[in-house]
From Swiss-Prot:
Homotetramer. Keywords: Amino-acid biosynthesis, Arginine biosynthesis, ATP-binding, Cytoplasm, Ligase, Nucleotide-binding, Phosphoprotein, Urea cycle. The gene is ass1. This is Argininosuccinate synthase. It comes from the Eukaryota. GO terms for cellular component: cytosol. One of its GO terms (biological process) is urea cycle. The lineage of its organism: Eukaryota, Metazoa, Chordata, Craniata, Vertebrata.
Amino acid sequence: MSQSKGMVVLAYSGGLDTSCILVWLKEQGYDVIAYLANIGQNEDFEAARKKAVNLGAKKVYIEDMRQQFVEEYIWPAVQANAIYEDRYLLGTSLARPCIAKKQVEIAKKEAAEYVSHGATGKGNDQIRFELTCYALYPEVKIIAPWRMPEFYNRFRGRSDLMEYAKKHNIPVPVTPKDPWSMDENIMHISYEGGILENPKNHAPPGLYLKTKNPATSPNEPDILEIEFKKGVPVKVTNTKEKTQHSSALGLFCYLNEVAGKHGVGRIDIVENRFIGMKSRGIYETPAGTILYQAHLDVEAFTMDREVRKIKQHLSQRFAEQIYNGFWYSPECEFVRSCITKSQEMVEGKVLVSVLKGQVYVLGREAPHSLYNEELVSMDVQGDYDPADACGFIRINALRLKEFHRLQKSKKN
């Protein structure tokens, strides 16, 4: 019997690609530990465990990461109002460091020298996985089959994988595969590739799994009161049904349910991948969309204007750091600490209506609001003397006058 090349912890999904990779790694002489993270995807985890064992995995770890994913990754993104290129709420990007961190913990526990994943050589996920692994386990060696010529020259497409699967008794799907790829977690579902690579092609009607068609969604809204403390959602109350949810996971799942029912959170975009190419992605982010709108509102109500300007810039950098895979970088740690500081007084309740694919803010209240109703009132003078505006306007007009004086002199 040939000597093992070493132990490798494989980020395993139970799908065709990683099942073939598991067998291929064994074929190359490695002992394989399969690791499957439960981050809220629709998956038969016990079936995946049995499949990995039958394919020859030495051990199988199935880790429930849902609560950790929400509290340690999604909540900081909510606090930041993190959004990539103005539209993408980063569902996949946030999940990757969460998954990879646990993969590293398992590798250290099992004294595994290697980790492996099934991310392609053109996408962002390879970067996100590997930067996390190298940050948290600098000595680790990474096996990325889709970047290895001996693998990608052998498996040039799905048909080659199917043939390999049949040869090695790897169970394959009995139903035809959708002509696109899909990635799901508790925050969102992403769809890309296949027929979606042509940016002119409309999303097929049966594509969306997390949200209903807004056109055929209920005609009556759900009214939700969302309470925040230090920028984190701590309670959701449905004012009609009088139901409440206050645990991080329960709250988020409930918002997914309500938003999905009303078709909230769909986007179809072209984005810039970190490695330089543009890609088309379709995303469903129901709960995240509600929280983004609600948090924006309570933050504007409670945060100083100049602090908010700085925080908005940091939020953009934070979104880029997440998207590009730098969650465990010193710069991302610094930005997170600044955002956490900015949220100290972001406390209050926001009332939203959820209807026909939209989230409407109806009202808000906060114990530490910077909104002064008397000061802003047209009926009460208060501490503000309208005559003071004259000097303010003249000072701000000074540079405008000088600029246009110069422009006029140039023309003459």
